[in-house]
Amino acid sequence: MMRTTLCLATTVAALSLVSSLNLTNTARANDFPTQDIRLVIPYGPGGATDIIFRLISQEAERDLGVSIVPVNMAGAGATLGSRNVKDSRPDGHTLLGSHDTIALSKLAGMVDYSYDAFEPIALLTQTINIPTAHANHEVQSADQIADYVRENPGQVRFSMIPSSTDHFFWAQFFQEVGIDMADVRLVGYPDTGEQVSALLAEEIDFAMFNLPSGGAFFEDGTFRPLGVAHPERLDGLPDVATLRELGIDMDHSTSRGIFAPKGTPQEILDTLAEAYGQALEDETVRSRIENEFGSVVRFLAGEDYQAFLDENEAALSAAAENIDFQN
């Protein structure tokens, strides 16, 4: 009888402890945030990604009632910052502001984790990518590139930053239009600036730019935008057809979102998503994103954002099959 009573008491105590812990976690989630939030941006200061996250976060902190402190943590192909957040306490006070590079880094063999190592909070913006030629090139639109390659096998030069967004862009583009990668020359550059210089010098045939990197050159006629990798035409390039209008079934963008460490309570994720969603309703914020940074506001949270990430990673994985990351 004493043993039975002891077992019962132990069980009750254990259940009470579990209940107490659950109540404590719920209380913590309901009290969130209890301190300033650290937003790790795994890139250097001053770039479009850094500025966009800072801009939106300054507005989001009004809703949260605490400061969101951006921390630039560049290095190791943006994996230094992502790993730091991945290994942080899942209490909502350390976040990651990043984009497709999370999946790209795993596909390139740089790390062993991808989107599934985090809790997705919200997609915020997309910067639409644009295949581009110099103004003197005979190709007038993206649907002419495949024929041009077939007419000049092994001679056509496409620029890219190895293992980066544009590397995957061209792999996916070649797959969609039926270009064999053995028939083209992929020329690697360390950054976008050097690709701009190479296209200005006509050392390459094609590059992948967007409005932040190529807008001024599109406007003055130095570069020719060959299509827009987005379901709809861009306000900044109303006369440039989408790739889908040209018969190329692909969209491609740099999709920026906010992530939390795995295990962060849903209530906290919802609170953060709501704050960032409210920030994107501000007309000044939206105007700067669209007009200064050539990006589009696209807000997705919860299951919708998870579905977007799943589709994004599947498309990148398919493109990765055509990439030799060792060369």
Please describe what each predicted stretch is.
Residues 9-22:
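Bacterial N-terminal signal peptides
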Residues 99-100, 135, 211-212, 230, ...:
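Short secondary-structure boundary segments
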Residues 34-36, 242, 267-327:
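An extracytoplasmic/periplasmic, membrane-proximal ligand-sensing/linker region
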Residues 84-93, 107-194, 243, 248, ...:
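Hinge/capping helix and adjacent helix->loop/strand transition within the periplasmic-binding protein
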Residues 160-162, 166-240:
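Ligand-binding pocket segment of bilobal, Venus flytrap-like solute-binding proteins
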Residues 1-5:
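Positively charged n-region of N-terminal signal peptides that target proteins for export
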Residues 51, 55, 59, 63, ...:
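Extracytoplasmic/secreted proteins, especially bacterial periplasmic and envelope-associated proteins
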Residues 27-116, 179-206, 297-300, 322-327:
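N-terminal (or domain-start) structured segment
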